[in-house]
Amino acid sequence: MRRLSITAICVLQAIADGFQYGFDVIDQTGLPSGTVYPALRRMEAGSLIVSKWEAPAVAQREQRPARKYYELTRSGQLALAEAASRYRLNERAAPRVGKPSTARR
């Protein structure tokens, strides 16, 4: 399995923690949109995540653009677990890897 970048690990962890659309991932990770959205595209192309658009009626009801929601695939879960075990020894490099979120939803 290919090693994940710190960015990819942070994004996968955010999705695993329940932050499932782009702006949520940006808020949770603190990474800029110019980093998060390309990472999401690469991870989807690599089958680590899948996406789906929310129902247009939901977005219309809430008077906002439709959101694209992301979910980890089994491959994404395995890649995140492997990264968590690899980086657990280096807490300064990836302090949240493998730990549940403490942020409120």
List where the protein language model places each region.
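Residue-level signal for threonine
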Residues: 5, 72-73
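Short, charged/polar surface micro-motifs in flexible loops or helix N-caps
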Residues: 17-21, 45-47, 75-78
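Amphipathic alpha-helical dimerization/coiled-coil segments
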Residues: 75-105
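N-terminal helix-turn-helix DNA-binding core of bacterial DNA-binding proteins
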Residues: 1-37
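Beta-hairpin "wing" of winged helix-turn-helix
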Residues: 46-63, 71
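Basic amphipathic alpha-helical segments that dock to polyanions
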Residues: 36-48
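Exposed loop/turn and edge beta-strand positions of beta-sandwich/beta-sheet ligand-binding modules
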Residues: 66
